[in-house]
Each structure stands twice: as structure tokens, then as C-alpha cells.
Amino acid sequence: MVRWLYSTNAKDIGTLYLIFAVFAAMIGTAFSVLIRMELAAPGVQYLNGDHQLYNVIITAHAFVMIFFMVMPAMVGGFGNYLVPVMIGAPDMAFPRLNNISFWLLPPSLILLLASAFVEQGAGTGWTVYPPLSGLQSHSGGSVDLAIFSLHLSGISSMLGAMNFITTVLNMRNPGMTLHKLPLFVWAIFVTAILLLLSLPVLAGAITMLLTDRNFNTSFYDPAGGGDPILYQHLFWFFGHPEVYILIIPGFGMVSHIVSAFSGKPVFGYLGMVYAMFSIGILGFLVWSHHMYAVGLDVDTRAYFTAATMIIAVPTGIKIFSWLATLYGGSLRITTPMLFALGFIALFTIGGLTGVILANASLDVALHDTYYVVAHFHYVLSMGAVFALFGGFYFWTPKIIGKTFNENLGRIHFWTLFVGVNLTFFPQHFLGLGGMPRRIPDYPDAFAAWNAISSFGSLVSVVATALFGYIIYDILVNGKPVDANPWAVPAFFQSTPEFWMESHTASSLEWALESPTPFHSFNMLPVQS
């Protein structure tokens, strides 16, 4: 018990993050199923026509999935576990800071769940816009609890980000220059910079909201000379980099997986790195594309349309580099590779709808419809989550030291693939038809597509239950694995090449035995 409470070992903390993320994923998935069941048919289904309750569920679904599932799993879990190992460091730069970064999250989650139980809950949507989040519309403590929850999770992420930046800059092994870093380490590094620059703005925005609610200030109240649009600018200045924080570690994981199962290095390594940095920088220059509908100046809208479309360029560079890596490789279609290929295909679709939504004139019609929901679930529910599953199947043999059942893994992939596409593809049509977000009832005309969408969500739940069984199966029935479970014997060579230098994996974690020892490196490795 003490080992896990007081642990300063990056691997232990990474494991805690991953367990926490699985727990949060169950809660978030439960919320999403409630949403889809309520929308399965027109009229009242399960929530007794309680629109406030519906919005509380929507809000909780978003917060749990973003702050307690994707970020802890990608940045906290895989980041903590793999970054020190990949750069040849004995641990993170600030191990005890790492410990508190994790332990701030459970209280934060408890605060968020508690907010649903006081008064009527926080039914603001994850954006928490005033005046809906103000004292008139949400009297009682629920929004305040949600704000404190965000504060804690934000502090956790910022401390973690400082830790990652320091670690990557100062603790690389001899010979590992920045231009030799594995792409996943680059991804976490860029993500940490984004976190460090964007979260303080969110903290300021929600702190001013807190004082508006409790201490009679009027930052967002026009009656006292404030402006609710100020909140939107501050929130989205954080909110847009945030969505790149969610996807960039996924880029890094997919690069490793595609490289390993194509049997060759990633095409255009340096281009990949600069593409990630460009995406990160541009992410701070496009926030108002979430606000085309609030009456921005026409020149402002023109700028944000153009800037948003420019983000598609580095993103396209990454997509085509992955395709070039695949092209001519000796492909092995394993479970992680399936998830990586699914990621590339579905992320591209999500990116295309993003370019469509970038157009201010079009977005005025599509804003706050299910078209937007479909867009960001294609990049998150099939981008970030598929990358996470790919990373799970790719690195779990290394982390736990046991294999998973390949057939079950493939069934998991195909079930989930069918489920998420059934869920979210019809939502494009609903959005084009004008069905608004965050409303638990809708006209009969939308019934058919909603029924299909809700059925898809049940398919996804089946896939998720299967994943739970797969975790059990690994722990109980998994066979022990070698240092590199993905190695292939090199034919026509006197030396078994995968002992010397593997074609299937080039980063340092595959040089250690599986499961990775508690102290990774007794002597620092040296990279030529």
C-alpha cells in the first residue's frame, strides 16, 4: 500500500495513471450511454424530460473523458512510463512532484462527481459559459465545485508538464541529441509546452467566474461593465490548444506503431517533429473559430478561417508521412497496427469535417449542431481513443511482461470500429439537418439516424466490455514475453539481428527485459 501511495517511481506512477484512466473511462462511457439512450427515439425516454439532468450528464461526460481519461492515460500514463525509459533516464526530473501530480486527480474527480449531487448539478456543458454558469442560472454550489475540480486537475497537469519539459531537456542519455529523440517523446514534450501555456488562461477565466458568482465582481456581467464574450475568448484560448493536447501524444504513439509494423523508420522524422511543433503553435492562433456565431467582425472571421485551414497543412504532412512509412514496408497486421491504421483513416475524416467547419459562413449554420459533435468525436473518439488502444496493445507486453490474445484483440478492434462509426457517422446528417446539440428531445424527422446512432453506441459498449475481459485475460492467461515481443527473426544472416539492432523497433524501451525492471538502467545507455 505504502509503495503505491508514496511512490516516486515513474513506472509506478504511470501505472496508477493508467488504472485511474480505466476507472474514469467506465464512468465517462456510462454517461455517454445514458445520453445515447435518451436520444434513441423522439420524446422522453429515460430522464423524465429533465433537460437540466441531461445537460449535467453531457457536462460530466465531457469533463470525465477529457480530464480524467484521455489526459491521464496519454500524458500521465504512457508519458510517465515511456519517456524516462525512451531517453535513457533513471526516472523523471522531479519524482515527488510526479507523485502529487497524480494524487491531485482523484480528489479532482470526486469534486466533479460531487457537483452533480448538490442542488441540480452543473448543467452548463463543458464550456461553462456565463451567464448560464452565473449565479442567476445556477444558484447553489454545483458550478463552484466543478470550478474547483478544474483547478485541481489543471494544477496536476501543469506540474506534470513542468516535469516533462525538465526531464526531456536535461535528462537525456549521452549521445541522444534532440534530433534523435523518439517521436513519442517529442509528442509529450510539445504537449507539455501547450499545457503550460494554455492552462493558466483557463485558471484565470474560471477564477474570475468564481468571483463573479461568490464575491460580487462583474467580469462577465454586462450590468457591471463586464462582458460574457470575454469568458469565451479566455476559455477557447485554452480550449483549442487543449484538443491538440489530447491528440498530439496519439500522433507520437501512432508513429511508433506504424514504424514498428512497417519494418522501417518513420518517413520524414524531422518533418514529423516540426509538424507537431507547427500544430502546437498554430493551435494558439485559431481559438475564435469556436465563436463565429457570437458576432465577430467580418475581418476577424476571415482571419480565423484562414488560420484554421493552415493547421490542416502540418496535419496533412503527418498523415502523408505515415502513409509513406507504410508504402513499400513489409506490413504485419497486428492488433496495434489495426488501431493505428484505423486512427489514420478516421482521423483524416475528422480532419476533413474540421476544414469544412473552419469556414465562418458555413459554421454559422452548423454551429452547435450535431455536425460539430460528429467532427470532434471523429478526432477524439476515433483519433485519441484508437491511438490509446493501439498504444495499449503495443506496450502492454513490455509493461506487464505478458502477451495478449491476438484474436480477441482483433475482435475488439473490429467491434469498436463498427460501433463508433455507426454512432458518429449518422450525426453528420443530423447536423446538416439542423439538429441542435445538448437538447434531450428532437423532432420526429431525426428519429431514424438517431436510432442508428444509439445502436452504434451499444456496439461500442460491447467492444469496451470485451476490452475489460482482454485485460483480465492478459493478467491471468498471458504468456511471458521477450525483451522485444514484436521482433521478427532476421533471415539470411549469421547473427540473429534482433539481438543487435531491431528493424521492428528502434527506441530504447525494447532493449530492457519485459516487464521493465523497477530501476530501468543501472548504467546509462549511450546512443551513437
UniProtKB/Swiss-Prot annotation:
It is found in: Mitochondrion inner membrane. Its cofactor is heme; Cu cation. Pathway: Energy metabolism; oxidative phosphorylation. A lipid is attached at residue 318 (N6-myristoyl lysine). GO terms for biological process: aerobic respiration; electron transport coupled proton transport; oxidative phosphorylation; respiratory electron transport chain. PROSITE patterns: COX1 (PS50855), COX1_CUB (PS00077). Cu cation binds at residues 240, 289-290. It is a multi-pass membrane protein. It is an enzyme of class 7 (translocase). PANTHER family: CYTOCHROME C OXIDASE SUBUNIT 1. Belongs to the heme-copper respiratory oxidase family. This is Cytochrome c oxidase subunit 1. It comes from Mycosarcoma maydis (Corn smut fungus).
